[in-house]
Amino acid sequence: IFGYPIAYAISRVREDIRNGVLLLIMLPFWTSFLLRVYAWMGILSTTGLVNTWLQNWGIIDGPLELFYNQFSLILVMVYAYLPFMILPLYTQLLKLDHRLLEAAGDLGASPIKSFLTITLPLSKVGMIAGSMLVFIPCVGEYVIPELVGGPENLMIGKVLWQAFFDQNNWPLASAVAVIMVLLLVVPIAIFHHYESREIEGEKA
């Protein structure tokens, strides 16, 4: 939802602005993943930056519960993995032949119709690649649910960890591991299918 509009906007701006935005997107990769998660803990806690700012401005009387809930889990997951969606999409959109859009405009197609019939289908491989890069690590994610999500917000990676190391429940852990593998095989097969079709199309 967020990755496509951002990638599309980056691909349409001037090159100097584009390079600056890409640098900002890549900047978090130069710092520790764990440090970035801990930074969000400081921002969202009851004494963190958001609550302090809202209380100082008189918007709220007491601190909001922004931490250890589904909101904080989704927010930090999106922050952590959004670049993995943006970069493949940006690369695919940058390769788009804009003469196709000009031709569609000359033939009377509106910008929305040109986007839906040309830009969106031609960026399908980038969407699939980005979805793969996000989905695979998210399935096994343990750090963010453990540090940010709290005990009530479970993900497969956290369930697997608890079954193995906390409960010593090897049958349950093995079953969860098999489910995780099956969840990963399907999108990998889909991505391989579309990638093979694109390679064949380029050769043709």
Regions found by a protein language model. Name each.
Residues 1-6, 21, 34-38, 47, ...:
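Membrane-embedded alpha-helices of multi-pass transport/permease systems
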Residues 27, 79, 84-98, 109-140:
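Transmembrane alpha-helices
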Residues 42, 142-168, 204:
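Glycine-rich helix-loop "coupling/hinge" segments at transmembrane-helix boundaries
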Residues 1-26, 98-101, 115, 119, ...:
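Transmembrane-helix boundary motif in ABC transporter permease subunits
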Residues 90-105, 172-204:
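C-terminal transmembrane helix and the adjacent membrane-cytosol boundary/short C-terminal tail
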Residues 13-21, 50, 69, 99, ...:
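Membrane-helix interface segments
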Residues 37-78, 112, 148-152:
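Membrane-interfacial helix termini and adjacent extracytoplasmic/periplasmic loops
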Residues 73-76, 132, 154-191:
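Hydrophobic alpha-helical transmembrane segments of polytopic membrane proteins
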